[in-house]
Amino acid sequence: MKRIGVLTSGGDSPGMNAAIRAVVRKAIFHDIEVYGIYHGYAGLISGHIEKLELGSVGDIIPRGGTKLYTARCLEFKDPEVRLKGIEQLKKHGIEGLVVIGGDGSYQGAKKLTEQGFPCVGVPGTIDNDIPGTDFTIGFDTALNTVIDAIDKIRDTATSHERTYVIEVMGRHAGDIALWAGLADGAETILIPEEEYDMDDVIARLKRGSERGKKHSIIVVAEGVGSAIDIGKHIEEATNFDTRVTVLGHVQRGGSPSAQDRVLASRLGARAVELLIAGKGGRCVGIQDNKLVDHDIIEALAQKHTIDKDMYQLSKELSI
């Protein structure tokens, strides 16, 4: 293999730049040229493709976001549109593609593979919801951002003796809510994978109040429902002074943590190794702190699951 491409797609996540850097440097180490595809699959279709050198990725490892920019591209679901993308890759002499992103990005890589172009997926999303890996690039940084925010909110919740409902990202996956809630001692954690009883939430808050607790933190993944509605329900049912904070896109930004930088470097380099070995149609991951790779079609057929033991622990510790 003489030339490969790399793109980032979908929602950005801290550590994507570290992965790009690893792809470029690993490939050049093996005398392979690397071309960056800007704005994800949209840039692939339009031909926004440029050669990357060692200097192209200098000093990007501590930066959040993605040097290659990113975008969502719904038209890439069309086979004819994907053929245009493949034509652009062949036009530039690119023989393999590294795709950094989440579930939608993997779907695009899978479709390209099925149409005969070798791709390797690298899991980049703060949601930590990609099958075949224990952790995704950006999750640890987002988690620390959320924990820092909750710490600050708890300070003011304590001062004003208030209940706070804090909404975090996670439309379909509750990892951020679960890990952050457990790490911060939240009184209640609501995630889309687990049904909840609002009466039970209310009863839990009242029990805390009866034993003298003056404030509470409830962490809600966005996929559960409206945090504002949950906050209103709590205030009406308890008469507790209740506030709602939606953390939003701050969770996607910031300099990546050491863990995300190292993870991204390992996964990006491994993706290049797979392409060199002629193993397209794969996705890389980390399991039990060891690098792994899976057939991307098989990986996408799996469903991300929450850590049931951790969820149970969070309930037991928040009595």
From Swiss-Prot:
InterPro entries: ATP_PFK, ATP_PFK_prok-type, PFKA_ATP_prok, Phosphofructokinase_CS, Phosphofructokinase_dom, PKF_sf. Catalyzes the phosphorylation of D-fructose 6-phosphate to fructose 1,6-bisphosphate by ATP, the first committing step of glycolysis. Belongs to the phosphofructokinase type A (PFKA) family. ATP-dependent PFK group I subfamily. Prokaryotic clade 'B1' sub-subfamily. PROSITE patterns: PHOSPHOFRUCTOKINASE. Substrate binds at T125, I126, D127, R162, M169, G170, R171, E222, R243, H249, V250, Q251, R252. It comes from Bacillus cereus (strain ATCC 14579 / DSM 31 / CCUG 7414 / JCM 2152 / NBRC 15305 / NCIMB 9373 / NCTC 2599 / NRRL B-3711). The keyword Chloroplast does not apply. It catalyses: beta-D-fructose 6-phosphate + ATP = beta-D-fructose 1,6-bisphosphate + ADP + H(+). GO terms for cellular component: 6-phosphofructokinase complex. Allosterically activated by ADP and other diphosphonucleosides, and allosterically inhibited by phosphoenolpyruvate. Mg(2+) binds at D103. Gene3D superfamilies: 3.40.50.450, Phosphofructokinase domain. Its EC number is 2.7.1.11. ATP binds at G11, R72, C73, G102, D103, G104, S105. Its main location: cytoplasm. CDD domains: Bacterial_PFK. One of its GO terms (biological process) is canonical glycolysis. The keyword Lyase does not apply. Homotetramer. This is ATP-dependent 6-phosphofructokinase. Its cofactor is Mg(2+). GO terms for molecular function: 6-phosphofructokinase activity; ATP binding; fructose-6-phosphate binding; metal ion binding. Pathway: Carbohydrate degradation; glycolysis; D-glyceraldehyde 3-phosphate and glycerone phosphate from D-glucose: step 3/4.
